[in-house]
Design a protein with these regions (language model features):
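Short loop/turn segments that connect beta-strands within beta-propeller blades
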Residues: 53-55, 99-103, 161-166, 206-211, ...
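Repeated scaffold domains used in trafficking and secretory/extracellular systems
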Residues: 22, 70-79, 116-127, 174-185, ...
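Bacterial Sec-dependent N-terminal signal peptides
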Residues: 1-33
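Structural motif
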Residues: 42-50, 94-97, 142-157, 197-205, ...
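Acidic, serine/threonine- and glycine-rich low-complexity intrinsically disordered segments
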Residues: 164-287
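A short beta-strand motif characteristic of beta-propeller blades
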Residues: 57-70, 104-116, 166-172, 211-218, ...
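Conserved beta-strand positions in repeat-built beta-propeller and related beta-rich domains
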Residues: 34-43, 87-91, 134-144, 190-198, ...
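Blade-level signature of beta-propeller repeat domains, shared across WD40, Kelch, NHL, RCC1
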Residues: 346-396
Length: 396
């Protein structure tokens, strides 16, 4: 994730001479992309769904529709940066670069061929300046004993590529099974998940100028997946837990002393300004979803609010996304199998949209259903949102 919490998304250009024309540039979101990983065991390829804000309609399998070919197996993440969208396709060892307006392919990159043989299984993306960064499982490997205790070995990588030539500009060794990444102040932050083995999870901090790095390790950080940063350098990490006694949640890692504090239970998170949105689902013994809590944590007040109460368990959330311009919240949901009551991972998903009101200081006030996009059909295996943000020039 490349979002800097508590940062302003305002672009202005003006002149003090009142006789000259003034203009300012306003970011505008045209729509939302939903990356869907498909279902590997059922041979269902991944896809991209697109919600157009003007029509409030969702169009599915848009990459395939525009390019006449499938994305392939298990796309995992996407990033809109400038005029392009980058899609990390884990199962194919490819990075797809497309025009963000049309989804027409600009380049299909075989990562282990173009970037180096260790660049296997691309996972997550972020960007800074003229570079896009991609995390790779790389040489990370896992194995299990007869009691299903996991052992991991080897490390992954993060590669920096030029946004014009798509050539490799740098490669950085990370830890075991790296996932989410972020860049700030010429430093690269990497969530080393250790594939939930809980033996050597960590956060890598790599100096992009010198290539030197350090690790943050803490007993509470056992399976880190996403990371966002404040201007002060504090880190906010989504950790999936150990699927046992340690629940998934959002943690703060202090920039002053690396102190780790748990903030909220969460299976996923996204943020805007000083607000972190997340959800947490509880399951019964047969792994049927029982209850989901939808919360927003504010960094300024350090308080937590509920932004939705799903009394009918209508939503089985799979991922969350927040429009970086206006703060609209989206949740992609799996659906229940009508016969078993369990989640059907082979069925099409649904998109649920929330209109959100913020104070003049950008603090969450309330959220409400958007009836125009409530339960819209999307692809199989939803896993990540990306937003089609462009700019308008207003002259005065």
């Amino acid at each position: 994730m490349a979002v800097l919490l508590m940062g302003a998304a305002m672009f202005t250009a003006c002149d003090d001479n009142d006789n000259e024309q003034h203009e300012y540039i306003v970011p505008v979101t045209k729509g939302a992309f939903l990356v869907c990983s498909g279902n590997m065991s059922s041979n269902i390829d991944g896809s991209v769904s697109y919600l157009d804000y003007t029509s409030n309609q969702v169009a599915n399998k848009q990459f395939q529709a525009q390019n006449g070919r499938s994305l392939g197996g298990t796309p995992n993440d996407a990033l809109v940066y400038g005029s392009k969208m980058y899609i990390a396709v884990t199962g194919e060892n490819t990075l797809e670069v497309v025009d963000a307006k049309t989804l027409k392919s600009l380049r299909q990159i075989k990562t282990n061929v173009t970037f180096g043989e260790g660049c296997l299984k691309p996972r997550h993306l972020t960007a800074s300046g003229d570079k896009v960064y991609i995390s790779f499982y790389g040489k990370s490997e896992s194995s299990y004993d007869e009691n299903w205790n996991a052992t991991t070995k080897g490390n992954g990588y993060v590669v920096a590529i030029d946004t014009t030539t798509f050539t490799r500009q740098g490669i950085y060794e990370a830890g075991s099974f790296p996932e989410g990444i972020s860049v700030a102040d010429k430093k690269l932050y990497v969530c080393n998940s250790d594939y939930a083995a809980c033996t050597k999870p960590s956060i890598s901090i790599i100096d992009l100028t010198t290539g030197s790095g350090s690790l943050i390790k803490n007993d509470n950080i056992v399976n880190p997946q996403k990371i966002v940063l404040t201007a002060a350098g504090d880190m906010y990490v989504l950790d999936f837990g150990n699927y046992g006694d340690k629940k998934s949640g959002v943690y703060k890692i202090s920039a002053k002393n690396n102190e780790v504090t748990r903030l909220i239970d969460a299976n996923d998170m996204d943020c805007i300004g000083s607000n972190i949105f997340g959800y947490y689902t509880e399951f019964d013994a047969s792994y049927k979803p029982v209850k989901t809590t939808y919360q927003v944590y504010n960094l300024l007040s350090q308080g937590t609010s509920t932004f939705y109460t799903d009394t009918n368990n209508e939503i089985i959330p799979a991922c969350i996304g927040v429009d970086p311009v206006v703060g609209t919240v989206f949740i992609a949901s799996n659906v229940k199998n009508a016969d078993t009551g369990k989640t059907d991972y082979k069925a099409n998903s649904k998109i649920f949209m929330f209109n959100v009101e913020y104070s003049q200081h950008g603090v969450f006030v309330s959220a409400s259903k958007n009836a125009n996009v409530w339960g819209a059909t999307a692809g199989v295996g939803p896993c990540a949102f990306a937003f089609n943000v462009t700019t308008n020039v207003i002259k005065y």
